[in-house]
Structures are given as structure tokens and as C-alpha cells.
Amino acid sequence: MEFQKGPSDQRTFVSAILNMLSLGLSTASLLSSEWFVGAQKVPKPLCGQSLAAKCFDMPMSLDGGITNASAQEVVQYTWEAGDDRFSFLTFRSGMWLSCEETVEEPGEKCRRFIELTPPAQREVLWLSLGAQTAYIGLQFISFLLLLTDLLLTSNPGCGLKLSAFAAVSLVLSGLLGMVAHMLYLQVFQATANLGPEDWRPHSWNYGWAFYTAWVSFTCCMVSAVTTFNTYTRMVLEFKCRHGTSFNTNPSCRAQHHRCFLPPLTCAVHAGEPSTSCHQHPSHPIRSVSESIDLYSAAALQDKKFQQENSQELKEATESSVEEQC
């Protein structure tokens, strides 16, 4: 009766792929300046400057008289009114930088987003950045744990522990990521309302980095659920195949107990197939940690049973010798 780890390996592989995808998307969104995009309402330059508004010339005399006087100057007027007097320039903003188009010359002008944030919101922004960094760090740790579990395919004991730690790390990282995204959204809304007047957006919307961050969060939580499912299945299968054997048949010898649990092969009862599994209702349900260390307890129980059998065999031998004498 061997401990089969094939289906668990497949689920672990799926968890690792989802975790790697989430890690890449979250890193890209953190470094991007496309969380929010929109337009800024900027007055057009005066007549005579570069990229000026549409103007026309009207001659006027210097003394305010008739226009055919000898001394004249040219006054520029524009017919543009309302929103036509303004330019709507695109901008984009991220956790680190905010870039907007310039009127005077083609190109963008970038500023640090923390310089635009109101002083009351800067601590919240730093908290959001810290949570986002911890989110990525925990995802990286989870990926290393899942990768180690995949490489140790013949050691289900450590695989259980690695799956448990990876699942907990993924859940924590997902919660931190959700908090980081919501905090940054709050900071941006406050900056859009209370930030510098030359930066306040006329209209804004979510950019691709915002959606990428939430897709990353979704992949992280799906990976966590898959890892927990893998761990639960391995624990239940392990208890079903091995727990009853150790309690009902002490002749099942456990090999040397280490972190890596060896496969167990033994007969359960005479006349029953080796693959049979019985669930005794009198056996209490063990916790997760007890299930992981089941081999250790079984090995101690088996050792104690061997000592008792050896003592009984010795006494029986002595009594038979005395009877013969």
C-alpha cells in the first residue's frame, strides 16, 4: 500500500503556475505608471507663444483714435470661448510617478507621486507601498516552497509541511495585496480632489495596471485555495491509508522516521486485500499537525510493542524450560 502523490503533484504544479503568474503581474503593476489615466484641463497659451491658440490681428491706433492713423499697433484676438480656450492633456499616474503632457513642447513631464499627495495621505501611501512590497515578497516565498515540493516528489511528509506553509503564505500575501490596492485607490482619490491645482485631473479612469493588480490578486487566491485543497487531500489520504494500519496491526513496521516519510507496504488483515481501508468510528479525528507526525507516533508505538513481545517471549521460554526440567 503506497502513498500515491501523482494527483497531488498535478495540483501543486497548477498552484505554482498560478503563483508565478500572480507574482509577475503584481511586480509589473507595482513598477507601472498606468494605474490611472485621464485628462487635465489646461488653459491654452496666450497669442504669440508657441502652440498658441487661433488668433487674428486687428490694427488699432496708439491714441485710441481711428484705425487709419499714422501710429498704429496690432492687437491679437481669438474667437475661442468656453472649453475651446482650454487644452485637454492626457496624464497617467502610478504608485511612484505621475506623468502628464506639456503644452509648450511635445513630450511628458513626470513628477513623483508622493510630492503631489496631500501631507495627510502620505503615510497611507507609504503603508500601501509597504503592503504591496510584502505582498510580492510572500508570493515569492510561496513559489519557492511550491517549487521545493515539486522537486521532492518522493517525500510526501515534507510535501505536507511545504504545502501548509505555502498555503498560509499565499493567503497572507493575498490579504496584503487587497489592502495595498484599496489604500492606493483611497490616496489617489484624495490627491485628485486636494492635490496641486496644476495637476488635478479633469477626468480619470482606471488603467491597465489597476486591472492587472486585481487579476494578480485573483490568481494568488486561486493558488492558495488549490494549495489548501492539495494539503487537505494529502492529509486525508495519508490518514486513510496509514492511520488504521498502525492502530489495528502492530506488525506494520515503520522505517526510520525522518522528515521525508518513506512509503509503507504491509498487510492489514489476513484474508483482506492490501488496498482495503477501514474507518473505525472509535478513533478520534486527529488535527493537522498530528496527521503530519503520524509516522513518529506509530514508530514509538511499534517500538514499545516490540519490547513487550520480547519480554513475553522471554518469560514464555523460561517457563517452558522450567517445565521440561
From Swiss-Prot:
Q: Say where the protein is mainly found.
A: endoplasmic reticulum
Name under which the protein is recorded: Germ cell-specific gene 1 protein
Q: Which Gene3D superfamilies match?
A: 1.20.140.150
Q: Where in the cell is it found?
A: Endoplasmic reticulum membrane
Q: According to the lineage, what is the superkingdom?
A: Eukaryota
Membrane topology per the entry is: Multi-pass membrane protein
One MF annotation (Gene Ontology) recorded for this entry: RNA polymerase binding
Q: Where is this region: Disordered?
A: 306-325
Family designation: Belongs to the GSG1 family.
Alphabetized UniProt keyword annotations: Endoplasmic reticulum, Membrane, Transmembrane, Transmembrane helix
- Any single Pfam family the record assigns to this protein: GSG-1
Summarizing the function annotation, the protein's role is:
May cause the redistribution of PAPOLB from the cytosol to the endoplasmic reticulum.
